[in-house]
Amino acid sequence: MGQHILAIDQGTTSSRSIIFSPKRSIDAIAQQEFSQKYPKDGWVEHDPEEIWESVVSTLKEVFNKCSVAPSDIAAIGITNQRETTLVWDKHSGKPVYNAIVWQDRRTAQYCRDFSEDEAFVSYITEATGLLLDPYFSATKIAWILDNVEGAREKAENGDLLFGTVDSYLIWRLTGGESHKTDATNASRTMLFDIHNQCWDEKLLSKFNIPASMLPEVMDCAADFGVIKEEIIGRAIPIQGVAGDQQAALVGQACFEKGMAKSTYGTGCFMILNTGDAPLQSKNRLLTTVGYRLNGKTTYALEGSIFMAGATVQWLRDGLKLIDDAAESEALAQRAREDNGVFLVPAFTGLGAPYWDPDARGAILGLTRDTGISEIVAAGLQSVCYQTKDLQKAMESDGARPTTIRVDGGMSRNDWVMGFLSDILGAEVERPEITETTALGAAFLAGLQAGVFNSIDDLTHCWKSDSVFTPRLTKQERDQAYDGWKSAVARIRCS
């Protein structure tokens, strides 16, 4: 058996396949973007067939980029955009509707209707660790069943299946032989009891979702099925699965209570390991499954920010202030210090800890001296300020991060990471391999395949590239953060 591991990283805007060597270095990466669909204001969809084709394309391409052969692969790991919802016919395999993406807000009215039952809203949080919000899968499934002709009847007859993206890919890769998910993805559906690690019958009944639609929930390192030989020329077991942010937690080797990782992709997601007991947040953070290995659940506290890299995309595509993301660092370095400009990127509302879907973005503090550099810098700083919001909320919940590790595309921007350390007042560690989401999936698959013996092996694989230390005084840090809080207060709607 080979010792290489193949990771499938199915994200919000693209799919990637990455081959990791036995030494945990990257042998090859293949990536393919796919289209985003916005049929109505606040709606975001993906074509399931485009997702599938992009995954298969990268699986084939990645082997053309290196000397590794499919026979060298010990196992496959899958990580994916979470909450995104698919429903398909279990006989034909055809989706009954496009994938409804995690960013989609069409079920806001569903949530408003359910919110009138305060006892039920409290039950959701107690059972799932989540807040009632369109972000999660439950109301997306309900919308599909209520709005796609014939879907409700088919579901009640046991003819439809639900899955987050991981589950859909497992189904397709195994030729329909395996309908499974892992505990991290299940924990993001708003249908999963994170304490008893099972689907919650009360929630299924309230949301009117047949239990027959749901996948079997597995550990993150487990046997999920074997991909069909015709896909890449060899039948290879799928042995590791985790939602993208939990996969990054594993890839960052945050296995000790108090360790946190913050991933900067389209959005920003900060997850703190809270150990073997779930910590219920009083500050609107999410209690979730960090990972589950050998039947033992490690819990986490999570804060979700909707706009991180997406803010840079808006500076580029919307305002046309930059030609590419790399240019933003040079411009920010030229910005006047203490310029008083704040950009609040509430383009689709505010995430944690505010959860204000009606808030809208603004640039505040503009003067005649304000130029492109100051606006770009404010956009980059907004990501750091929002991370500070999460840090403060975690500390208020009694869970102060002891270690903060960063990854994702924006983590390669030294200016941003320097300011992040400044505003957090803490050291920020960046690893040698910033592809930690895919690495986490590879780690999990490697554990099940026997490439790794234990999580101690994974801890020793993690290597630091850079450590950023705070330069601001406490007074300077507090003054800057007070300015941010004032800016947010001015655009809040709830």
UniProtKB/Swiss-Prot annotation:
Disulfide bonds: none
One GO term (biological process): glycerol catabolic process
One Gene Ontology molecular-function label: glycerol kinase activity
TM regions (residue ranges): none
Keywords: ATP-binding, Glycerol metabolism, Kinase, Nucleotide-binding, Transferase
InterPro entries xref list: ATPase_NBD, Carb_kinase_FGGY, Carb_kinase_FGGY_CS, FGGY_C, FGGY_N, Glycerol_kin
Annotated binding of sn-glycerol 3-phosphate, by residue: T12, R82, E83, Y135, D244
CC annotations in GO: cytosol
Activity modulation notes: Inhibited by fructose 1,6-bisphosphate (FBP).
Binding positions for ADP per the UniProt entry: T12, R16, T266, G309, G409, N413
Pfam families: FGGY_C (PF02782), FGGY_N (PF00370)
Pathway: Polyol metabolism; glycerol degradation via glycerol kinase pathway; sn-glycerol 3-phosphate from glycerol: step 1/1
EC number: 2.7.1.30
Catalytically driven reaction(s): glycerol + ATP = sn-glycerol 3-phosphate + ADP + H(+)
Residues where glycerol binds: R82, E83, Y135, D244, Q245
UniProt keyword annotation of ATP-binding present: yes
Enzyme class at the top of the EC tree: transferase
Keyword tRNA processing annotated: no
Biological role: Key enzyme in the regulation of glycerol uptake and metabolism. Catalyzes the phosphorylation of glycerol to yield sn-glycerol 3-phosphate.
Family label: Belongs to the FGGY kinase family.
Name assigned to this protein: Glycerol kinase
